[in-house]
Amino acid sequence: MTEYAILCEKASAAKNFASALGGTSGEFEGHSYKIVHSHGHLMAFVDPKEQVPDDKAAQYRSWKLEHLPWQVADFSWEKQPIMAKNPRTGRKKSTKSDLTEIKKNVKDCDALVIATDVDPSGEGELLAWEIINAIKWRKPVKRLYFADEEARSIQAGFRDIKPISSQQSDGDYLKSDARSKWDFLSMQLTRIATTVTKQAGYPVKVVREGRLKSLMVRHVHEQATLVKNYKRKAFYEVKFQDNAKHVFARQFKDDETAAKWRHAVKADAATEMAQYHNSAITNVKTARRHSAPPKLLDLSNLASILAPKGYNAKEVLSTYQKMYEAKIVSYPRTDDSKISMAQFYQLLPLVPAIARVVNVDQSLLTHRKPRFTHVTTGSVDHGANRPGEKVPPTLAGLSKYGKSGPAIYSVVAKNYLAMLGEDYQFDHVTAELADYPSFKTAFNVPVALNYKLIFDSSRQISDVDETQGEAQGQLGQTAAPFIFEGANKKPVRPTMKWLMNYLQHYNIGTGATRVSTLSQITAGTTALMKERRGALSLTDTGTISAILTEGTIISSTNATKRLMTLMDQVGSFKLHPDELLTTATQTVTHDLPIMVKNADKLKASLGEPEKLVKHYPKKAKTGGQTSTGKEVSFNQVWGGHRFTTQEVADLLAGKEVQFQIKTKRGKPMAVHGKLAQQTYRGHKFWGFKPADDVFQRRTKSRRKAR
């Protein structure tokens, strides 16, 4: 008998575990083990109609609003193996075979050890217990915790494998299971949104609503509306300027105070300016100040920095995950904002090599002691995002993990190295006018850039202009009055930086959760948003979603934050999972009538429904009389080939024509055929029809090649 069956989340993790422990099976420090792995989630909830008693199935199948909200007590929460389509072959495959394989491999083991990712959301725990239940495992279950897939971390976790007395005593599982059930129940909101939209006459496929996605969409819509409705209101204000271009102005504590000195008419400002004369500058004070490097970036910050370079959320998420599995960077789904003391000293010897790869001057890396703004003496789960212990030889080679690979490593590495740079030093200068002391100036003069020469993440992730307040040169001797033309502040356009900063400010989700959600709602035919080089805009469906969720719980920032707090309480045994699920029913009950009412606003924002219908360009037609005297019309282009006048005449005469086209892969392909009447979805039409052997011959040649 083998003592431990170690269950990893995916094949890449199993490979790293095998490397750390000495093989896919064997013995490590007196304990025999065998490594098995999943391929992510293998189980999923069955459809709502299959979750409930037979006499209620029709009700739960229906999308009619009269059947909402659902009764949580009706649900069995049954799961089944996932049936997924292979994107390359198009074939569907059930995960049942994976479960069978795992069950066969662990049957002779004494205990099953959960070694899935230690995710802050508890997703790894949920994934593992789904498998444990599916294979009907009845022996002991244990947990191996690890910070990352480095050998040191895996070995430390193996030495400290912890028992789990029962599924219900695993807080991470309870949290993730309750969250997945809440999200399943939120499907009702998608049904509401889709139904009321179709009833209003808009031809949507589905309007997706959900825990974080609805908040994101609504917030982007609100900001885009502010931008759209912005009207510039100029004002004129008297200020002073010296000959070194330093501006002296009154300091206002609020807009009401500022309004007293900001004139709507330029002539009024000129009248005020006539009261002033040139004034000497006095009370000049200079203070030497310094600022430490900004904190380490989370995944949402990283993605928002890379978005303007053309790397979308899905690309960054996918590539970072592959680089983590190769030990190039740290664990992506971390909730930590600092690293541990041990992690700091583990990377310290690698600093010269990391600096060489990203072309950072090593003479700047002189701060070799832990900064307690970045390093904690306490414990961390994974530690903040940072370079891994495997240093790549070159940046260019990282493109094998994804096109954003070099850019990801460059930002992550430089951000980490900035911590080892000295503080930025600058002189903070203040002064005022001798004759008009209420007119003051303040600016910073850089003395030593230090860490800013390595990487300044605060400037990289900011969605506002931070150059204001920095100046060069000495103050002048005197300053003269002038009329400054300003305007009410223009709202910031919605960008990925702006959105991620907002969510981070309210501590909603981990960095990886934010990026993952954005990736989901910007992909596919039912996308709610579009992201182009960091700029965010809504699709028609996204606009519909935003309008429908105005005033709802599902799109509320405070409600979303509260919901995530409740989920954490489930994980720490402070809240029963059933109590969390009642909030899903409360949300649907509250939001349903609001969304129905909001549907009346769609026309005002979107126009008449037909304007949303996608109009495809008309295809070029040709035609004439066939040999039987029938007048026909057919497409002049087939497979990218445009029929010549002679080919059209031959087709009408019933003759066969031959020509070359290119396949989707760009390979040449010979085609021959005739004009024929055909049927597609019950509709009869005339068009070119390739001979039966055209595609048959191609299939045979492919088989031979194989």
Where are these regions (language model features)?
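Short, conserved phosphate-binding/catalytic loop or strand-edge motifs used
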Residues: 149-153, 298-300, 319-329, 333, ...
